[in-house]
């Protein structure tokens, strides 16, 4: 697919790469979950957009898989240190034709029903409610909840960027973009209410998981059952 990146909408990949490497350097020694969250925020807030007036489902970011490349370095290092003995054992078992096994950091199974029922704002609210319901939290748990909430906030911000970009096309007289923008705007404040909004949210969420974070989403299916309630409305 040919992309038409809006140069005024954000940083080109090389400038984005410089910004991400600085974040990584400045946060050296901090937990990986904290560093990754800040990197994710920067990509979603700053990468260039491609919003096409022919497209009902804008979601494109000019990020050059930079977050994935950085994370890939971490995984190589982790395999060489913490997992070295374990992986040596699985390699021997593989060579002996006992079984095949390897480290896997990249498969997720999102709860699509929860996503479509709650939306990103609802998922964030549920997360914070779960945190607040706990009487005591370790520092590790506090960090997890904070990073998860920040990740969802960044996702809402990205959808708002898409809504702003489609707003500009709508202002030029494009009625289709007016509909697209209105639907995207709904996703920044609540759950999807229409079929278009449900489809938009699914496309955006899938893209962010698979292309920005580079996780292999293994639970996208049953779209007839997922979308049918919205179709009936």
Tell me what each language-model feature is:
Residues 1-131, 135:
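Long, non-catalytic protein-protein interaction scaffolds
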Residues 124-233:
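Structured, charged N-terminal subsegments at the starts of enzyme catalytic cores
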């Amino acid at each position: 697919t040919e992309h038409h990146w809006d140069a005024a909408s954000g940083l080109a990949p090389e400038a984005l790469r410089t910004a991400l490497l600085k974040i990584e350097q400045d946060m050296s020694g901090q937990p990986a979950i904290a560093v990754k969250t800040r990197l994710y925020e920067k990509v979603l807030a700053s990468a260039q957009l491609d919003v096409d007036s022919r497209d009902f489902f804008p979601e494109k970011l000019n990020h050059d898989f930079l977050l994935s490349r950085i994370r890939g370095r971490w995984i190589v290092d982790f395999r060489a240190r913490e997992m070295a003995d374990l992986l040596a054992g699985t390699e021997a078992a593989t060579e002996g034709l006992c079984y095949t096994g390897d480290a896997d950091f990249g498969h997720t199974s999102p709860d699509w029903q929860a996503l479509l029922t709650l939306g990103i704002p609802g998922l964030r609210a549920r997360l914070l409610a779960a945190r607040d319901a706990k009487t005591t939290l370790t520092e590790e748990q506090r960090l997890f909840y904070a990073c998860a909430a920040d990740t969802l906030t960044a996702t809402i911000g990205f959808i708002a960027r898409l809504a702003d970009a489609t707003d500009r096309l709508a202002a030029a007289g494009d009625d289709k973009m007016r509909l697209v923008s209105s639907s995207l705007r709904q996703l920044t404040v609540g759950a999807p209410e229409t079929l278009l909004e449900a489809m938009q949210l699914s496309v955006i969420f899938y893209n962010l998981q698979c292309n920005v974070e580079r996780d292999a989403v293994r639970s996208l299916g049953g779209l007839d059952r997922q979308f049918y309630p919205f179709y009936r409305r």
